[in-house]
């Protein structure tokens, strides 16, 4: 885990002097927060250019955070496990990442809750190198293979372990490789660093278009997710420390208002219109390919920020089947403390 001092130094270098005050402990706040409102918010995104986390940057691009009176600084950390560490240390006030971290952290006696649940499917795709596609036809063929995940302890790691466990395999039966995302993932698949791996758009679209990779399992849709995981698996969320949520309800409400407004905007516009609002450098594989990646993934987002009632239970079931942190502790997890709809209900 990064030390708090290191993270603060990084934030101070990346942000303006005023924004760097986000390094104060998010769980206690300051005088401005005593009244329940603190309009300066730092949010870590688990890969800001990933389409599965598109609502975060799109909200900023549309100006909805500012219209709520918020000064939001979006930071990026491709590995979800590292993003949660920065939240726990108090150096950011929220994370846009997978919901499953709230369950995993509760078993470590940390209270983290999703305040806006933007998707009930992972949006992840298990890709296989084209020259290995004839040998790896399903997760049962993972044995002896090098499998790429964003990083150990990330949601891609969780899901990979679960897919393997359904075939009677454990993580000892294959080699887990930290492959990151984007160009690092593509390079790993191309040069043989991994045989298969889990990633998202726009990386998926680039691999398929170039012929370097083929889709093995597609969890960008409800149908594909249920086939792979036996039910819904909530992913993209804004999760925050419970103490911060309790101390700053006005700020959290404003964040929910902005994000839900974006979700509704997404459902009212085409992939082309969405792509046009995003930073040009997000389309580093080409504009048409970026539009396709949005079109292939955008259906994962809901329009209201609410959690599907059955989804948390399936996440707990998945984690409880293999995760050393959760396995055997399922009965101690209080799912009602891992998410709330009270803010999106008012948005």
Question: Residue locations for each model-derived region?
Answer:
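Secondary-structure end/capping motifs
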Residues: 245-325
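Conserved C-terminal helix/tail region of periplasmic/extracytoplasmic solute-binding proteins
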Residues: 313-347
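Soluble non-cytosolic domains of exported or imported proteins
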Residues: 50, 77-81, 150, 154-155, ...
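Short, solvent-exposed loop/beta-turn-alpha elements that line the ligand-binding surface or hinge
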Residues: 67, 134, 138, 220-231, ...
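Solvent-exposed, polar/charged alpha-helical surfaces in well-ordered, non-transmembrane soluble domains
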Residues: 54, 62-63, 85, 89, ...
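Short, low-complexity disordered leader/linker segments with a strong preference
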Residues: 1-40, 347
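Pocket-lining segment of extracytoplasmic ligand-binding domains
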Residues: 184-187, 191-279
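Short, glycine-/small- and polar/acidic-enriched structural segments
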Residues: 29-170, 175-179, 195-201, 212, ...
């Amino acid at each position: 885990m990064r030390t708090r001092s290191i993270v603060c130094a990084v934030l101070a270098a990346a942000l303006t002097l005023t924004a760097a005050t986000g390094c104060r402990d998010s769980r206690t706040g300051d005088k401005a927060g005593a009244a329940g409102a603190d309009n300066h918010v730092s949010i870590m995104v688990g890969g800001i250019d990933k389409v599965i986390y598109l609502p975060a940057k799109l909200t900023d691009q549309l100006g909805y955070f500012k219209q709520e009176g918020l000064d939001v600084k979006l930071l990026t950390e491709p590995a979800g496990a590292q993003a949660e560490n920065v939240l726990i240390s108090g150096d950011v006030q929220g994370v846009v990442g997978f919901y499953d971290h709230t369950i995993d952290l509760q078993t470590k006696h940390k209270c983290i809750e999703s305040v806006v649940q933007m998707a009930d499917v992972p949006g992840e795709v298990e890709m296989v190198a084209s020259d290995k596609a004839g040998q790896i036809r399903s997760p049962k063929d993972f044995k002896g293979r090098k499998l790429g995940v964003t990083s150990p302890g990330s949601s891609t790691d969780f899901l990979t372990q679960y897919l393997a466990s359904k075939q009677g395999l454990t993580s000892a039966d294959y080699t887990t490789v930290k492959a990151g995302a984007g160009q690092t993932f593509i390079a790993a698949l191309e040069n043989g660093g991994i045989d298969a791996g889990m990633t998202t758009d726009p990386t998926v679209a680039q691999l398929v278009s170039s012929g370097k990779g083929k889709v093995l399992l597609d969890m960008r849709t409800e149908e594909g997710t249920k086939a792979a995981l036996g039910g819904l698996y909530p992913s993209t969320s804004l999760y925050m420390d419970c103490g911060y949520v309790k101390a700053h309800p006005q700020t959290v409400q404003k964040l929910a208002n902005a994000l839900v407004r974006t979700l509704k905007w997404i459902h009212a516009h085409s992939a082309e219109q969405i792509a046009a609002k995003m930073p040009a450098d997000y389309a580093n594989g080409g504009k048409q390919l970026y539009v396709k990646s949005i079109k292939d993934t955008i259906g994962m987002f809901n329009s209201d920020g609410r959690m599907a009632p059955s989804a948390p239970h399936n996440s707990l079931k998945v984690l409880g089947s293999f995760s050393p942190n959760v396995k055997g502790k399922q009965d101690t997890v209080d799912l009602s403390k891992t998410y709330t709809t009270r803010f999106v209900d008012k948005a």
